Structures are given as structure tokens and as C-alpha cells.
């Protein structure tokens, strides 16, 4: 074979067919679900791309493969055939340089508990009956209240393409919730990104502990410009709704003024004159003010 490196995909989170996940309450139940006849049929289908993993207290542990099983099977058969012919030096390895996991909180900031992410090698399940982190270090635990965050993993070796029981050996991601109060509902959503290569020559790499960064939540009130505020007011102001027949009021004529009209003074966003009065004013109905960020606005009656 002239080219002994294959790039079958560069992807993002893959879950089992129809967006399902392998979930369980403890390690033994998780392993049984992974290696059962049912899971063998489900994991035989290509995993979907771009799927978020929902984490809830119902399924405290979740697992996803980093390679769709059909893709891994085809690569294994191809490399094995070429190896037996003497065209390549090995039966192939899976190389994943790094895995980037984005975690988002989907519950109140007062939620207790934490989320743990582990990069695992399925070989650990056959030897110690538990999915241990790769290198004993590729694991990170983050309080749910501190999310959003990004975690990066990097294994120090390439994974041989071989069979472990009735499954292909593969790198995978385990997510685990601990100390969560909410019952049944999704409290965290995770999304992973990585690239995977199949190679004929294995290698070792410098070992790193997982790196993670907390992401500053977007401040959707503070970062509104004056133009955005005006557009927001125009977008929520609908005369046919505020004054329409559904509310028992006729539509206003163009030369009439509604007695309920108020003025919004953009104090922090608009230059003021010597008397401290805002130069730019936006007239909207009292009913359409709901939802506006009031921290930088004052409301005065005419």
C-alpha cells in the first residue's frame, strides 16, 4: 500500500443510532450494556455526527465511541488483509491526537454536583472490569455550577485495531454525574470534537494531564448596543397586537397619541445635554417594555 495513513473522518460527537446512548447506574451495568447482544447490533451502525450527549441523573454514566463501528471494521479488515500480504508492517492502529469536549449547563446555577469526563481505552474493561482513564490521568471533574467549560484530552499512545470480546478495541469518552439533586432532567449537555487516523505504524507521545478552561458566559444584556436596543424595541412593538381588536381597542390613527405611551431614556448609551436629559428617545407602549434590560434604562411618564 502506497499510503498507510487513512483519515476516515474528522468529526464531532457521535452517539449510537437514533441518538441513543449507553447509560447505566454503575460500572458493571454500563459494561454489560456495552458488550450485550443488543449493543452489538446498535453499535454496528454508523454513529451520528454532531449530536450532543444529554447527561441526567437517570443515567449517571454515559459512554460514546470515538470511531463508528462500521468504519472501524472496514479499516481493520483492510489493514489485516494488507498485513497478511506483507504490504504493511502491522495490522493497524488508531491514532487520535486530542479530544476537545465542550460542556454546557442546562439547569440553574444553584445545581449541586459535578460532571467527570474520562478518555478511556476499551482494553481496560477486559482486564480490570472498569473503564479507567487512559494513562491513569485522562480524567477531569468540573462543578456543574462552574460551567460552561472546555476540556482537552490527549492519549500518549496509539490504539491497536483488535477485537475485545465482541467489540473492536477503541478509544471512547465516559461522562459521569455525581451529587446531582435534579431528578430525571438533563442538567449538562456535552459535545466532543476530534480527528481520528488509522496508521500502519504505532507511536508514543509526550504525556499531558487534561487541560480545561472555564468559558465566560455571554452577557446578553451588557453587550447590547444602542442600535441593538432600538431594533429590539421595534421587534417587540406591534401596533396591531398592542392596540388591535383582540384587546378591544381600535388601531390608532397616525396623528393620535396613545395616553399609555412612555419614553425610554438610554442613559448609559446616549450622550446627554447640560441638563442631563437624553438626546435620543424611543417611544414605545407600556405593554412592549417587558423583557427589556432595565439596568441601563429609566422609564419616565409623559
Curated annotation (Swiss-Prot):
**Would you name any one GO CC term?**
host cell plasmodesma
UniProtKB keywords? Host cell junction, Transport, Viral movement protein
Family statement drawn from the similarity comment of this UniProt entry: Belongs to the bromovirus movement protein family.
* Compartments where located: Host cell junction, Host plasmodesma
Function text: Transports viral genome to neighboring plant cells directly through plasmosdesmata, without any budding. The movement protein allows efficient cell to cell propagation, by bypassing the host cell wall barrier. Acts by forming a tubular structure at the host plasmodesmata, enlarging it enough to allow free passage of virion capsids.
What is the protein name given in its UniProt record?
A: Movement protein
- Can the keyword Chaperone be found in this entry's annotation? no
Major place of residence: host cell
* Species name: Cowpea chlorotic mottle virus (CCMV)
Q: Which Pfam families match?
A: 3A (PF00803)
Q: Which GO terms describe its biological process?
A: transport of virus in host, cell to cell
* Keyword presence, Cell membrane: no
